[in-house]
Amino acid sequence: MQPDGDDGPILDAALELFGEVGIPRTTIGDVAKRARINRVTVYRRIGSKDDLVRAVMARESSRLLVAVAAAAAEQTSRADRAAHGFATTIDSVRTNPVLIKMFDSESSLVLEQLTTNASALLVSAINAAAHIARGELESDTFAVPDAPEIVVRVVHSILLTPSATAPLDTYDDLLAFAHRNIVPLLVGTT
């Protein structure tokens, strides 16, 4: 049995199984077996399968935001931080095999968590976008009011509907798009 509060092994096991067999085919029993714990422990620590999916999605979102912040921090200007933050977010989700499997899942819960119940996820992303774009500045002044929310909603839209008219297939495409459209919202024209 894991120490109280250490849900990492459970979430790791669930994440692996979601990637291997998909969310619909993963059971609490499978997760418990992979985590080498009793099935009751999963229910006690996490809850239902829906709670498990939510917990995995929340943890992966947090990990993604940390990686995006680290990539943005390597840049020297606010404009480059904003552009690389944008491009890294989309590229990281698109290239993560488990997240791809979750996006492609037939699970109505995943779809719900990415659309109608995405507010908690979006708020976290908006706060992270504001922090990244603000950089060393202490104020929340952006070129366009509500710019971090607009940017996150654009990212969200691109992830849910990858293809339209703008070329957004490669990291360089994403950077160019960000410099044309995202940077002016956050930091003004460069």
Predicted regions and their residues:
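Basic, helix-initiating cap at the start of DNA-binding domains
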Residues: 1-21, 25-34, 51-54
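Amphipathic C-terminal alpha-helical segment
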Residues: 91-95, 131, 149-169, 181-190
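Helical hydrophobic small-molecule/effector-binding pocket
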Residues: 80-104, 113-121, 130
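Amphipathic alpha-helical packing segments from all-alpha helical-bundle domains
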Residues: 62-65, 110-152
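Hydrophobic alpha-helical connector segments
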Residues: 51, 55, 68-95, 148
